[in-house]
Amino acid sequence: MAELPIAPVGRIIKNAGAQRISDDAKEALAKALEENGEELAKKAVELAKHAGRKTVKAEDIEMAVKSA
């Protein structure tokens, strides 16, 4: 089961144009977001370490997204 709250995930799908969404679809998107988010976070941590910092900044996340 995904750790992300399901209601906001459902809103993301609705904002994309869906009228109805199954619970399985919400769970699947939540799982995918978590997996992708964790990979981006790992890249951002490495970028922060490379810059000599322990703190991950927004710029690290942005660079991780661009390099993905």
Swiss-Prot record:
The UniProt entry, under Gene3D superfamilies, shows: Histone, subunit A (1.10.20.10)
What subcellular compartments does it reside in?
Answer: Cytoplasm; Chromosome
Which Pfam family, giving just one, matches this sequence?
Answer: CBFD_NFYB_HMF
Q: Name one GO molecular function term.
A: protein heterodimerization activity
List residues traversing the bilayer.
none
Gene Ontology CC = chromosome; cytoplasm
ATP-binding as a keyword of this entry, yes or no, is no
**DNA-binding recorded as keyword:** yes
Q: Where is this site: Interaction with DNA?
A: 14
**What keywords is this UniProt entry annotated with?**
Chromosome, Cytoplasm, DNA-binding
SUPFAM superfamilies hit by this protein: Histone-fold
Give the residue ranges for region: Interaction with DNA. 20-22, 54-57
NCBIfam families tied to this protein? archaea_histone (NF043032)
State whether it acts alone or in a complex, and with which partners, per the record: Homodimer or heterodimer with another histone. Dimers then assemble into higher oligomers, with the DNA wrapped around the protein core.
**Record's PANTHER family?**
ARCHAEAL HISTONE A
Q: What does this protein do?
A: Binds and compact DNA (95 to 150 base pairs) to form nucleosome-like structures that contain positive DNA supercoils. Increases the resistance of DNA to thermal denaturation (in vitro).
- What is the similarity comment for this entry? Belongs to the archaeal histone HMF family.
Name of protein? Archaeal histone A2
Native source organism of the sequence: Methanobacterium formicicum
Chain's gene name:
hfoA2
